């Protein structure tokens, strides 16, 4: 089998499609020379045979076979007939997956305007035509005529709007025996708009606008600049203004608007099929009316209905009454499928699930370092499975991948020590949606934890705008060495202390951290349990607190031989001196008691503090290692 070469491209550009381009999307020449692509019938499938109707919205001749390597009539089956076009049904024998990308088209009996360009904000049709949006709508929806050529009539101007009565009056004057009026042309509907757009010489209009901009100011200048910008964009993209009206409508592949049979024999179908059916029905009816030379008022009404059907297909509800289906539910148009949070871009393209990633609720991990995160064992073994398998084979515990997977599935105790080894020094990235700035995704060193929640250091919460009331975070594993290096050097949490927006520290204790520090170090005169007791050292005092002999805020005395004691206020003033009779002296300060020898050396020093302050000081000292 020949390897397919990947098409290389530099960028994707979105531009207005010409009618020829739309026709090219859907039109194909079969190997036998038959040209197919135009959808002419509104039928979907035959409800007796359950096969797609020919030339309908699910036609196998246009879009490809419903079953792999099988034509519509069943004459050709199996892959050996690849590429053959059936003489009976005209279906090319190929894979059914072509129905996911082969398009069709509908040739319209009359042009229609594209609702995005008419009713969008701003309305590009009204900007290009230099007319009010209300006036353009009047023309498009057959409520007013527009003068396409004033001829020799002095009372008419180019692009002037006329009501039905005014046009009837002018017609009477034109067809009068003594009339001298010549060359007057008026139009209505999208055909008139298409002609007005086609008559625009974009380069000439752009030059004229540049001259006018130089001579004008204020609101008029802003309006001219807006029009020039639109025209310049048309020129730059080699697009023509009349392409904003449609002569041909693309029909998207049938597998993207499926029809499936339910248990009760009923069918569930995509809303697009109903919208396409409306367009085809009205288009066929209009073509038939034009053939039989029906009265102009009937043809005009059918053209308006066709315009409304195409509007509903492209963007249902943008203009006029919303088309509804069963249970008065608005039908989902092409725009509804593309736009919004559940649309194709945000949901399916940007919101794809990626390999080597997981998601779980976050809980606080107070014992973690700032650059660490607690990763549940269950999640870690899944994320790091390839690395664990490689390590198991390298250590000779298993011989192949299958045996390694079996060992992991069984939950063998050996795998946990291997997992510990694998994750050491391998950072993971944590991301919390919405990622509004670069600190919304940071790297951490994983620590294996029990349970099913990711543990996060409380100090990194402001960067993620996270809290622990049920927030979820995603974990991603950088696979290549380059990615791991970048994660460690650039994205590690301890390297992201400053806010990129303000340059101020974003890592700052808040809420319960500040409250905890305050509570530990606060003074409470009412705490009398064990107050005034003496302890030989810090450990003794903490042991007494653990056994409930002293309160957290009780004032106690601790022997502390280090001279360097920091107090809230300078404590250098001796309040009282007591001679102990053995040549030593006891000096009493506000928060200290010092026993000095004959030569003034410190024998013993007691300082007044609380168990809470001891805990705080000890924790800080251990963290800073001084």
Curated annotation (Swiss-Prot):
In cyanobacteria the RNAP catalytic core is composed of 2 alpha, 1 beta, 1 beta', 1 gamma and 1 omega subunit. When a sigma factor is associated with the core the holoenzyme is formed, which can initiate transcription. Coiled coil: none annotated. It holds the Pfam family RNA_pol_Rpb1_2. Keywords: DNA-directed RNA polymerase, Magnesium, Metal-binding, Nucleotidyltransferase, Transcription, Transferase, Zinc. Zn(2+) binds at residues 71, 73, 86, 89. Its EC number is 2.7.7.6. It catalyses: RNA(n) + a ribonucleoside 5'-triphosphate = RNA(n+1) + diphosphate. GO terms for biological process: DNA-templated transcription. One of its GO terms (cellular component) is DNA-directed RNA polymerase complex. DNA-dependent RNA polymerase catalyzes the transcription of DNA into RNA using the four ribonucleoside triphosphates as substrates. The keyword Magnesium applies. Belongs to the RNA polymerase beta' chain family. RpoC1 subfamily. Binds 1 Mg(2+) ion per subunit. Its cofactor is Mg(2+); Zn(2+). This is DNA-directed RNA polymerase subunit gamma. SUPFAM superfamilies: beta and beta-prime subunits of DNA dependent RNA-polymerase. GO terms for molecular function: DNA binding; DNA-directed RNA polymerase activity; magnesium ion binding; zinc ion binding. Mg(2+) binds at residues 467, 469, 471.
């Amino acid at each position: 089998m020949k390897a397919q070469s990947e098409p290389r491209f530099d960028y994707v550009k979105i531009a207005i499609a010409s009618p020829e381009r739309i026709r090219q999307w859907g039109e194909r020449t079969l190997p036998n020379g038959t040209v197919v692509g135009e959808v002419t019938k509104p039928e979907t499938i035959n409800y007796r045979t359950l096969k797609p109707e020919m030339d309908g919205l699910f036609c196998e001749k246009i879009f490809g076979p419903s079953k792999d390597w099988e034509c519509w009539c069943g004459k050709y089956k199996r892959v050996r007939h690849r590429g053959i076009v059936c003489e009976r049904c005209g279906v090319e024998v190929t894979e059914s997956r072509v129905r996911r990308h082969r398009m069709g088209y509908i040739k319209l009996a009359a042009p229609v305007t594209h609702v995005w360009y008419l009713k969008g904000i701003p309305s590009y049709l009204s900007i290009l035509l230099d007319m009010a949006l209300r006036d353009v709508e009047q023309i498009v929806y057959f409520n007013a005529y527009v003068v396409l050529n004033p001829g020799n009539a002095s009372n008419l101007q180019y692009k002037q709007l006329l009501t039905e009565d005014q046009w009837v009056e002018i017609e009477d004057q034109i067809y009068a025996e003594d009339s001298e009026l010549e060359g007057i042309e008026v139009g209505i509907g999208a055909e008139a708009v298409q002609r007005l757009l086609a008559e625009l010489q974009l380069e000439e209009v752009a030059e004229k606008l540049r001259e006018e901009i130089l001579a004008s100011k204020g609101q008029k200048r802003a309006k001219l600049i807006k029009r020039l910008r639109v025209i310049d964009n048309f020129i730059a993209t080699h697009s023509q203004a009349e392409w904003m009206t449609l002569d041909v409508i693309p029909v998207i592949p049938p597998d993207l608007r499926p029809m499936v049979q339910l248990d009760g024999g009923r069918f569930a179908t995509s809303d697009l099929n109903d919208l396409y059916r409306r367009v085809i029905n009205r288009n066929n009816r209009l073509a038939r009316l034009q053939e039989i030379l029906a009265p102009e008022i009937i043809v005009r009404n059918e053209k308006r209905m066709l315009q409304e059907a195409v509007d509903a297909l492209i963007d249902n509800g943008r203009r006029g009454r919303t088309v509804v289906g069963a249970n008065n539910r608005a039908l989902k148009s092409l725009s509804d499928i593309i736009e919004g949070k559940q649309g194709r871009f945000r949901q399916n393209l940007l919101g794809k699930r990626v390999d080597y990633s997981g998601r779980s609720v976050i809980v606080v991990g107070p014992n973690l370092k700032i650059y660490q995160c607690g990763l549940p064992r269950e999640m870690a073994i899944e994320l790091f499975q390839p690395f664990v398998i490689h390590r198991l084979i390298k250590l000779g515990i298993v011989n192949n991948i299958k045996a390694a997977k079996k060992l992991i599935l069984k939950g063998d105790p050996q795998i946990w020590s291997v997992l510990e080894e694998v994750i050491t020094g391998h950072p993971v990235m944590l991301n919390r949606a919405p990622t509004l700035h670069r600190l919304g995704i940071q790297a951490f060193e994983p620590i294996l934890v029990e349970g099913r929640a990711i543990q996060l250091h409380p100090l990194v919460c402001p960067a993620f705008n996270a809290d622990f009331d049920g927030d979820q975070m995603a974990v991603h594993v950088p696979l290549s060495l380059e990615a791991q290096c970048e994660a460690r050097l650039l994205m590690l949490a301890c390297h992201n202390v400053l806010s990129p927006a303000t340059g101020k520290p974003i890592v700052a204790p808040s809420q319960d951290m500040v409250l905890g520090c305050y509570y530990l170090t606060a003074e409470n005169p009412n705490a009398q349990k064990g107050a005034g007791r003496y302890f030989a050292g810090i450990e003794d005092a903490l042991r007494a607190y653990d056994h409930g002999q002293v309160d957290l805020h009780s004032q106690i005395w601790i022997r502390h031989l280090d001279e360097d004691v920091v107090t809230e206020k300078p404590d250098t003033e001796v309040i009282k001196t007591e001679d102990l009779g053995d040549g030593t002296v006891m000096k009493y300060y506000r928060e200290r008691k010092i026993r000095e020898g004959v030569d003034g050396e410190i024998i013993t020093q007691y300082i007044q503090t609380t168990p809470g302050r001891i805990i705080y000081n000890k924790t800080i000292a251990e963290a800073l290692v001084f």
